[in-house]
Amino acid sequence: MKPAIPMLAAVFALASAATAQRPVRVFILAGQSNMEGHGFVSADAKRNGGKGSLEYLTKDPATAKQYAKFLDKTGQWRKRQDVWISYLDRHGPLTAGYGVQPDMIGPELGFGWVLGDAFKEPVLLIKCAWGGKSLGVDFRPPSAGKPPYSLGKNEDAAIAQDPGIIGEYYRETVSRVKAALADIKDLVPGSDGRYVLSGFFWHQGWNDRINQQFTDEYQSNMADFIRDMRKDLNAPKLPFVIAETGMGGMEETNPRALALMKAQADVAEEPEFRGNVAFVGTRAFWRPKEDSPLDQIYHWNTNAETYVEIGEASAEAMKRLLRMK
């Protein structure tokens, strides 16, 4: 019976090699601070008794079963061997800790977990996110041109001296995505370099919803962003998911905030985008400060549950765009 052991090992090795040689499914994640991710991982008693942290969610009887998937058999954070992430200067298997700091998460955790379970192919997430960036200026797509209004005396002077400020992070996103695709063999162990650019996940909007001019042109800027990004990545039908900037939840009443959220939803309803762009409402994922680590409305109160739910819902929307069950 002993010879069967090496034979069995060989079978598993061949199966593993076959899996690794499948084209990698690549998804781009982009936005500002809430795509970076400010959801706390560790349950610090000094932060509201740890409520709303990922660790707390794995221990709270009300959520422990649902969040057990993020833990391995030893109780440590599970590292997926079929989903990988590249986020600025960090990369590796998807696990808790790929937020703006190593003890934080963003939407990438829930997003990658759902898609990793959905695909037989390995998955790579390329996350390009920077805090405090607007679509009106920083991510402004080429087709939108220069803002047709003054940004203020100092800002106008800075742009006159350096026009590259306009759209800087749009171009940086394109550059980083292309660099990651070129390095895919290093980013995804076992990859032969083949990939399928499968989707783009956008979560951004705070810096636009606090500026009336940015809010007024958000829908047109977002539409140009989608068109330009598809062109620059040579992916004319690339599915896009827009996760609402729903901080404040269902009780939000600020007219500009509501207008910005409506603009995000309306993009997906434009005739050319129906069936290839999806809007994901996020206001229901809001958790009050009483259930969260910190009182920071602009960062979803740093609640890990919120970030996981945004990611999961956006992945489900992506699956629908990709015609997956």
Q: In which residue ranges do the predicted regions lie?
A:
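Positively charged n-region of N-terminal signal peptides that target proteins for export
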Residues: M1-A4, L115
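Hydrophobic residues in alpha-helical membrane-spanning segments
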Residues: A4-M7, G31
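Bacterial N-terminal signal peptides
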Residues: P6-A15
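Sec/Tat signal peptide C-region and signal peptidase I cleavage site
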Residues: S16-A20
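Cell-envelope and extracellular/periplasmic
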Residues: Q21-K325
